[in-house]
Amino acid sequence: IISVSPALFRPEEGKHYSVGIHPWETGATPDFELLERAAAHPSVAAIGETGVDRLRGAGIDTQTDVFRRHIALSESLRKPLILHVVKALDIILAVKKECRPAMPWIWHGFRGNATMAKQLADNGILLSLGSHFNTDAAASIPADKLLVETDESTAGINETAARIAACRHISLPEVIALASENLQRAVAYTV
């Protein structure tokens, strides 16, 4: 899934996308109409990146309001939500508890520890690991909550998956199968 902002969304045949107003882009007035149009496109499999970043972007209240709009869109279109979160776990979990979404949430680029991974998994959030991750967390994430990503890394997906496999003491094909099944289940509502 390729993550793009609504303004840059130019779908190509055979590719799947997520569209969202990234927390870093919440300082300008967000164009929710453009987001809604792009999100409704059949090649869009997920909504986001969205969430709250305490280190960058507009104020927390603005980011949280934009996040809630993304949640509503995710629910109305029945597409999973991709999260970008920095030092805002408390806000994300409070909003999730309040909104009680039916659609899956995917924590993009998860770098937290095993305790945080358990807390998120217990709240039904899938955890996507990129090239930088906590090895104890990678070993402890429940099998049905594990995803693998490349993001902007030069490391290929297989290289990242192999490192995760080593942490979990399983084979590379097993990690790829787990992550593939989990992604298929997460986007099953849309494709």
Please report, for each region that a protein language model flagged, where it lies by residue.
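Mid-domain alpha/beta scaffold segments of enzyme catalytic cores
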Residues: I1-V191
